[in-house]
Swiss-Prot record:
Its main location: plastid. GO terms for molecular function: electron transporter, transferring electrons within cytochrome b6/f complex of photosystem II activity. It holds the Pfam family PetL. It comes from Arabidopsis thaliana. The chain crosses the membrane at residues 4-24. One of its GO terms (cellular component) is cytochrome b6f complex. This is Cytochrome b6-f complex subunit 6. The gene is petL. One of its GO terms (biological process) is photosynthesis. It comes from the Eukaryota.
Length: 31
């Protein structure tokens, strides 16, 4: 149970970081 929870949390964190980096690159390109 703990392994699944930590894996889900890690996946969510990775997705969030990827989204933030993608949005940041998009803003830089637009500017």
């Amino acid at each position: 149970m703990l392994t699944i929870t930590s894996y889900f949390g890690f996946l969510l964190a990775a997705l969030t970081i990827t989204s933030v980096l993608f949005i940041g690159l998009s803003k830089i390109r637009l500017i």
